[in-house]
Amino acid sequence: MVYDEIDPFSDMLVEVSGTVPFIKLEYPDISGDPFLMENVKYEAAKTDGLSNGDVVTITATASKTALKAAKKVFSRTTMQYTVEGQPFYLTPDTVLNDEQMAALRSCMDTLVEAAFLNGGEDVQHGAQGYLYGDAWKYWGSEPTATLVSCDNLEAVVFPASGGDPGYVEFLANATVTFCANQGNAQPETFSACMCITSKYIEMQGNDITFWEVSHVSFAENQEKAVLSLRKKDPTCKEIPLPAAE
């Protein structure tokens, strides 16, 4: 009996969707061959929680009876698919190359610059809270916050959990001049750890494709800020950022 050798993966379309570590692998279109569609079962060793670089083995199986009746034999029963080029969330497990580190530094520079636009609109609430606590009587109708200096930049990265991609705290030693009420209060210059919370950082290749500032606050110093963050989650990771080019 002559058997027709067929490749069960010849027309397989593999689709990868999502963002690492929430990648999902599917193979919605197998083949137009009626035999393959009706008799072959495909199973991937892993379909969820994939990362770039993961190699997934997909296995094709069919009953001996079906193969014999159709006079067919498989040329292979497994294929390997490599996940690559997918966007990823920055997590404590992410290993960054020099270009990605530079992109992260550039992102923080942008966040700091944006925070002090419009009289430091995004910083005003955090500055007043740091200086005066709940003494809202110091708050005026035209507050301003101006950045004097900023150095020792770092990111503290929190892990993904469930469907939450985690978040990032950008920290820096900052000197800021704050005036609670123009014309009725003297400007105050203070030095503290500025904390810029980003909901998450999404990257693809060497580029940052998404970030979003949640809020800006201040702590007494960077060491205490990190200790406070580690109390929230001991698995968070500090990433010192390179000097600006």
Residues of each region from the PLM?
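Beta-rich interaction/scaffold domains
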Residues: 1-115, 180
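Membrane-lipid interaction segments
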Residues: 36-38, 42-44, 135-154
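Exposed beta-strand-loop-beta-strand "reactive/processing" segments of non-cytosolic proteins
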Residues: 48-61, 147-187
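A short, surface-exposed beta-strand/turn
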Residues: 69-88, 180-219
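Short Lys/Arg-enriched alpha/beta "domain-start" segment
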Residues: 103-147, 158
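Viral structural modules
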Residues: 110-117, 121, 184-186, 209-212, ...
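Extracellular/mature segments of secreted proteins
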Residues: 115, 201-205, 243-245
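C-terminal partner/receptor-binding element of secreted or periplasmic proteins
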Residues: 218-245
